[in-house]
Amino acid sequence: MKLYSFSPTPNNRKVEAFIKHFDLPVEIHTMGFRDQENKTDEYLQMNPMGKAPVLQDGDFSLWESNAILTYLATLHPETGMLPGDARGRADCDRWLYWQAFHLLSIIISLSDKKKSLQKDIDLNFGVLNAQLEGRDFIRGDLSIVD
């Protein structure tokens, strides 16, 4: 397995951190965007969006960081990062979607729109802080959402 990554971004870093923390058998290839490695025909066949990360597992290519985390956690249940029951899995999915669609979009926009986004920032971090109250991790136990 091989991960094509661009380390400076949060979505790439979280996948790299998961792989490194659990010492998973995944080769990490740091992308060179200056030389437009992500625009080659070969890369665009793996990810038509031309973005990173991408996980290549044999002839299977997977892009989107949360999908990659879920795939790796499913392949490696010994990590204990993905619950086996439907409710636990749905709860992980909820927090992964929330992170991707709400929290990350706010963080990305902070530099340009901090003042206008303060209400959204307060709301979303309030949700996160309330969920973390009295616990170390979002779901209580460490999982892929953390």
Where are these regions (language model features)?
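GST-like domain detector, emphasizing the conserved glutathione-binding G-site
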Residues: 1-123, 129
